[in-house]
Amino acid sequence: MTSSIDNLFTPGLVAAQQPQWPGGSDGAAVKSAVQELKSLPPLVFAGECDDLKARIALAAEGKAFWLQGGDCAETFVAATADSIRNRIKTILQMAAVLQYYSSIPVVKVGRMAGQFAKPRSNDLETRGDVTLPAYRGDAVNDLEFTQSARTPDPQRLVRVYNTSAATLNLVRAFTQGGFADLRRVHEWNKGFIRDSSVGTRYEEMANEIGRALAFMTSAGVDPDAFKSVDFFSSHEALILEYEKALTRIDSLSGNPYDVSAHFLWIGERTRQLDGAHIDFASKIKNPIGVKLGPKSTVEDALALIDRLDPDREPGRMTFITRMGAANIRKVLPALVDGVTKSGAKVLWVCDPMHGNTYEAPSGYKTRKFDDVMDEVKGFFEVHKSLGTHPGGIHIELTGDDVTECVGGGEQISESDLASRYESACDPRLNHSQSLELAFLVAEMLRDR
């Protein structure tokens, strides 16, 4: 088994966006962390990954809808029970609204339990006359701007595993132990409508859901499906020492799976066809996503499909588009049309966050809620015009009442950003903005 894993990946390939570990990637510190990770139990199981792959195949055919959400970058300090519960609660609330109005299952995926690393535009950060390594996520170094905090530490990869294990333990408890009961989720949504300044717009939608639940209760319908949900984990496969160390051979099928998460995606900055990240993704059997930005071409998309899904396996391949509101209607049609004409079946997911980031005068990175919604709207418009399926959304969000994105029903302004800006990296939709987005997307699903 060990020799199979050791010989699985192509050696000598360039791996973009990797940390500059002290002593190098072959140093004693990295080897020690990797050996420890290799000895640890899987965080997820191959059968769960295959289950998710089957659901992705349904979403690609328009028979399910993908909802993926969570932090831009998880941090160790924020991996508390309250924070994890609030994120799960937000995703469950969004899913209930989307599922009712689409009348199809919603595949619930957390951008959590592993999203501890981030690619960066620059290796270094300068403040005044001090230059230090850039913060690459808690998997690599610390946000504090000191030499010791910013020095990459491979032992943090072991802490990523331990924190992810604790997070997944809570996720499973919350989603299987009654917390996720659909009737409880509906009561939460009623609370949002009661307390939100835009709640009246969605009151009738919520009342419809309430009447449907009341009817089923009166008819004696009480299925187990009401009481628990299936919830999957995902993160960007970025730090290859971590991902390779957590790749295992499944005892039943004999196939390799990355057991750090159910779903892994390759980012826009690391999807080089001849690079180590695509080589890694091509060798594992998990469902795989790839981010496509505004400069992506049909040729790029088709080459990625050939490399990652040569057998055209249903549910294997997801494209997560991150175009920006100004580009989505111009760039996406050719991509979707070209892939569709090739005969490949992929899931198309809209990431309306990363293409709409800008710096406010105060220096905070932020996003306009209206831009986020406009990109989602453009995504739906393109698929409707082509007769294809808008398969899902990928949202950076938190369950907390932060002030990181401007606009929405709460009318957060650029001057409000400083009041509660907590993200370690990019701005996230807060709880209220996330639910508002879900109600707006539900209207699009109803009319698709």
Model-derived features with residue positions:
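Non-transmembrane, aqueous-exposed alpha-helical and coiled segments at domain scale
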Residues: A301-L304, P310, R316-W348, H354-T403
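Long, contiguous, compositionally biased segments that the model treats as domain-scale units
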Residues: T2-A139
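Short, glycine-/Ser/Thr-/acidic-enriched flexible segments
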Residues: C72-E74, M112-G114, K295, G324-A326, ...
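N-terminal charge/polar-biased segments
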Residues: M1-L40, G407-R448
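Active-site-facing alpha/beta catalytic cores
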Residues: A79-G324, R367, E375, G392-H394, ...
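Glycine-rich, charged/polar anion/phosphate-binding loops
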Residues: D51-K53, D274-H277, L304, P333-L335
